Amino acid sequence: MGEPYEAVRVNPSDPEYQKLNPAGQVPALDTGDGAPLTQCSAILGYLAHTHPDAGLAGDETPLGQAYLGRWSAFFTGDVHPAFFPVFMPQRYTTADDEASLAKVREAGTALVRKRLDLLQAHLDGRTHIVGDTRTYVDAYSVPMIRWASSILPGGLADWPAVKSHHERMLADPGVERAMRDEGLIES
């Protein structure tokens, strides 16, 4: 967005943080008006609309905004949760043996693949997820596609349009800065 910001690492169970976000989840944005904003989709939409010069809000028509909402919801409600069984298999079984946990991870990996299949079909022949310009949804996809690339044998080889999109986003200066701020890449 080109605006200064401060990224702060928090412990979601910290009582001080829970005053900001009682759900104890990240992210949260202090908008400066006394009402913190939570949920990634809401925060990204807010930032895109309050910083229009960044050009991340996409087509401002009702249908254009509906498409942004649809794809943002896809990542929030379909893609992100598909990783839960992979990263936290103990949440999905009462068994604690490695064989049972491996089966849960395998089921999660299958869900991730299905989500990538849907995204691949959508991105085939496109440069961006929504419309003809980069939007906040493109940036929002980066962490989840990065996870997929790291957990799947062969990375993103089976999803060439997803891989191309992800590589373009990794080269984006704003994405690069955010990843550097998160300690995911070196300065």
Residue spans for each PLM region:
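Positions that flank functional sites
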Residues: S13, R134, L184
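Active-site-flanking alpha-helical
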Residues: A48, M144-I145, M179
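GST-like domain detector, emphasizing the conserved glutathione-binding G-site
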Residues: M1-E106, A110
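Phosphate-coordinating loops and pocket residues in cytosolic domains that bind phosphorylated ligands
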Residues: K19, A171, R180-D181
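GST-like fold's C-terminal all-alpha helical module
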Residues: F75-A171
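Terminal-tail/helix-coil boundary detector
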Residues: A178-S187
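Residue-level signal for nonpolar/aromatic packing positions in well-ordered secondary structure
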Residues: L29, I43, L68, L119, ...
